[in-house]
Amino acid sequence: MLEAVHRGARRIEGNPIDTVSGRFAHGAQALALELAERLPAGALRLRDPVMRVLVDDGVVAVEAASGVTTARHVVVAIPPALAVEAINFSPDLPADMRSLAEGTAVWMGGVVKAVAVFDKAYWRDVGLAGAAVSYQGPFSEVHDHSGPGGSPAALFGFAAAAPFDGATPEQIGAAFADQLYRLFGAAAATPRHVHVTDWSAERYTSPRAPSPRAATTGYGHPLYQRPTAGRIHWASTETSAQHPGHIEGALWAGTRAARAILVATEAA
């Protein structure tokens, strides 16, 4: 579906936004949960935010709420802008590194996402892909978010968070349902439930005070490809030179950081 300004929604052939790809049957968190189960007991600490990273004489000390952990290397896997806002680095990061991090926008950091759940994926029965691009909004894209075989049935969309500033999840959900009605007909107007997340308000996703100059131009910057002070490795998806902003980018950045640490360890 394509929704143009002042022209309403119209059906177009094919799928305008979704290409051939793979999806996690039980959500992307399934990968993280599976990997977490393979870690040694006590290796993973939840609800334990890092407050300070100190590099001194070849040793990295990471200070968190639970105490201090030392290592030879540290991997920063959160968005750089969030890292430099929330973590005190000592010695301070080089000026060019800090400036780059502050100016690197968090992918989807200023976005509201909504998932409308239905009893069945009725749009498939009438030959619709469940995908839409809208220039009228407030949601700019809609995707079929259903599980294997269409169950559970769901449509997902995202919109800029700024227009919803101060809105409740219920109000955002209602706006999404109204737009789905315009796009996919009356059956879309009454979802069983709408899940809403404002990523701009998530403490560990978006900085509390994003830089007004934040942009995606810093994605995959050369400074992210090598460790700062030889010990601090940047591995969020924004730092990836390949597919930045996507899961593939996060995997690529994590692999790059791991390889760099292995090389440094073997050479020590």
Where would I find each of the regions flagged by the language model?
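Aromatic-acidic/polar surface patches that form glycan- and anion
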Residues: 17-28, 43-46, 67-68, 105-109, ...
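Active-site/ligand-binding neighborhood in enzyme catalytic cores
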Residues: 1-49, 77-87, 139, 212
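Short glycine/proline- and charge-enriched loop/turn segments
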Residues: 12-16, 90-100, 209-215
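Conserved flavin/dinucleotide-binding core of flavoenzymes
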Residues: 59, 110, 126-268
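A generic "structured core" feature
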Residues: 44, 50, 60-62, 71-76, ...
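Amphipathic alpha-helical segments that form well-ordered structural scaffolds
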Residues: 30-38, 115, 175-182
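Phosphate/oxyanion-binding loops and surfaces in catalytic or ligand/nucleic-acid-binding neighborhoods
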Residues: 38, 81, 121, 183, ...
